[in-house]
Curated annotation (Swiss-Prot):
The keyword Iron-sulfur does not apply. Guanine nucleotide exchange factor (GEF) for RAB35 that acts as a regulator of T-cell receptor (TCR) internalization in TH2 cells. Acts by promoting the exchange of GDP to GTP, converting inactive GDP-bound RAB35 into its active GTP-bound form. Plays a role in clathrin-mediated endocytosis. Controls cytokine production in TH2 lymphocytes by controlling the rate of TCR internalization and routing to endosomes: acts by mediating clathrin-mediated endocytosis of TCR via its interaction with the adapter protein complex 2 (AP-2) and GEF activity. The modification Phosphoserine is found at residues 535-536, 549, 552, 652-653. Changing residue 500 to A: Greatly reduce AP2B1-binding. Highly expressed in dendritic and natural killer cells and at lower levels in other myeloid lineage cells and in pituitary. Significantly up-regulated in effector memory T-cells as compared with naive T-cells. The lineage of its organism: Eukaryota, Metazoa, Chordata, Craniata, Vertebrata. This is DENN domain-containing protein 1B. Residues 635-654, 671-706 are annotated as: Disordered. A motif (FXDXF motif) lies at residues 398-402. Keywords: Asthma, Cytoplasm, Cytoplasmic vesicle, Guanine-nucleotide releasing factor, Phosphoprotein, Protein transport, Transport. It is found in: Cytoplasm, Cytosol; Cytoplasmic vesicle, Clathrin-coated vesicle.
Amino acid sequence: MDCRTKANPDRTFDLVLKVKCHASENEDPVVLWKFPEDFGDQEILQSVPKFCFPFDVERVSQNQVGQHFTFVLTDIESKQRFGFCRLTSGGTICLCILSYLPWFEVYYKLLNTLADYLAKELENDLNETLRSLYNHPVPKANTPVNLSVNQEIFIACEQVLKDQPALVPHSYFIAPDVTGLPTIPESRNLTEYFVAVDVNNMLQLYASMLHERRIVIISSKLSTLTACIHGSAALLYPMYWQHIYIPVLPPHLLDYCCAPMPYLIGIHSSLIERVKNKSLEDVVMLNVDTNTLESPFSDLNNLPSDVVSALKNKLKKQSTATGDGVARAFLRAQAALFGSYRDALRYKPGEPITFCEESFVKHRSSVMKQFLETAINLQLFKQFIDGRLAKLNAGRGFSDVFEEEITSGGFCGGNPRSYQQWVHTVKKGGALFNTAMTKATPAVRTAYKFAKNHAKLGLKEVKSKLKHKENEEDYGTCSSSVQYTPVYKLHNEKGGNSEKRKLAQARLKRPLKSLDGALYDDEDDDDIERASKLSSEDGEEASAYLYESDDSVETRVKTPYSGEMDLLGEILDTLSTHSSDQGKLAAAKSLDFFRSMDDIDYKPTNKSNAPSENNLAFLCGGSGDQAEWNLGQDDSALHGKHLPPSPRKRVSSSGLTDSLFILKEENSNKHLGADNVSDPTSGLDFQLTSPEVSQTDKGKTEKRETLSQISDDLLIPGLGRHSSTFVPWEKEGKEAKETSEDIGLLHEVVSLCHMTSDFQQSLNISDKNTNGNQT
């Protein structure tokens, strides 16, 4: 029970009694009058009159006349039913209203009206007023209610009363909002409690209630006594006292003080001698008349000192004495002590939300941890958590001043905005959890799988480097022969090497894609269409996420490099790859990697070579047969030498690098001759005559595409680009444009090769003629 009051009572009150007390305690009180007259619950009719005179009637004085007090009965559902009483006629007559509504001020005022009717002997008016209120629906909070003699009850705002003076009622009240914080002086209970008890005793009583002790409060004034009980219990909000709760104990129930379980009981001072004769042990006793508190425990010292000092300073301020200052000061203390319960809520798909006690207790200071270890065993805290979980699992959610105080005070470790969104979606039936767990976008799932595989591969890379370092120390191996495991691999390495070789051979035997976009293999066409669909569904989130880690990838794959750059040697190494010695091949998990990262390339290369960023960029922007040929292959290394850093980091010299790459490549391929180069006018479907020539022409095309991609990389990569820009296997309209660009590049390369060959032949002829002349 997170709340002891009934949520939706059927009516404003259940019973009204007029009870007379005899001069002798041995005689039971007698019911003189009741409303409604047909009320038939005999148990209530027998027990309520005994609560109407909770004192020693033989010793009571005349000063009890006109006092209001409230007792509480608990029904079979553990809900509290309040008995609002007013003593009249020298304390021998008591008017009592029984209701589930904790409207203290309203019913105290109504009791005064009823006492006035009885004093004037206006029984007809009394019955008419009660009948109207009894049959009227329960008014909503903050709604004005007007009681008029000989008229039905009507609900109206203050403006209506001003416009129609004839409707001025005999009694008027506003239905209180019991969900808000009590205020001073509007709340009679809190006002009397704050005035009667000093701050130190309030703190001691608060600490004892948090430890669920057996507590007795004593006073000679019934109104002050019950006000202190109700007021102190209200300061536990959002928690409620879960044990024996008797605001004022009648003489026939004094044995309850000997109960072994926790209780909160108010006793009139005329009965205190009888209580002390029962030899009470481990009882916290507060005497309101003398403002003293006796306790065998040091409960206040068990609370965190910072929480206690802040609460004490707040209560001593003059500004706290009015409004909700007192209630809010205790609410803030409750939030500081228990507000971190949010961080201990746990949810698993298909299971109800639960509360983890271990997570709630850990990571706190020693004093706070010690208190929370005790608090998790308290009934008031357990019922509070059960109530919160019940609302969450029912999809209702909750939002009250306690949750607002936690958020504003920062008493939980989570993000307040995420918590508010969480509660908001829980009100809709837990849609956020279902969406997050079962309807995640492909980009989110891809990022999750990538991060998981990346972590595993990172560990393997560290192990590989450590093993290589040991081998270098033992055998003196050259650093250029190190085989580095690529950081980004889109294949599953659990498969065997034989399976990967089969896949590599299958790719090498695959027919080339013609420049007009037609594929010769139906299976490849199906695979590409499925891959393109996946890539378009993933969206741009994964691209942005993966691009953030691009620099870290470059750092991890960077190999030691010393000496001057040998661009010609590097280009020759790039062109000297052999189809018989391919790297590990596998299908890519997501095509977002090709769209979002410039440094990832799946190119068939030698195992013994180190990765280079110059040959990593061209696949992302390439198209045609080369991009199709290299799909899904491993870029683990280029053998021999290490290539220079990424061209993207040398913006100022990019133009010089372009021309240098082209000249070096042309010079390195002079020995092939003009006969090995396809005629640029021979059409689009030209054929490569030998593996070496194929590698040469392919290298030229690759280099040209790489240089084109470098210029794109100088812009902000991965931002503002269309998703299809980096997909080399897209067909239809866009491929025609890309094909024309490739044709232009091929024409330039082939023409340049022809010019170089002709120039070389002319040089050879001139050299021969010169030698002949000299001879």
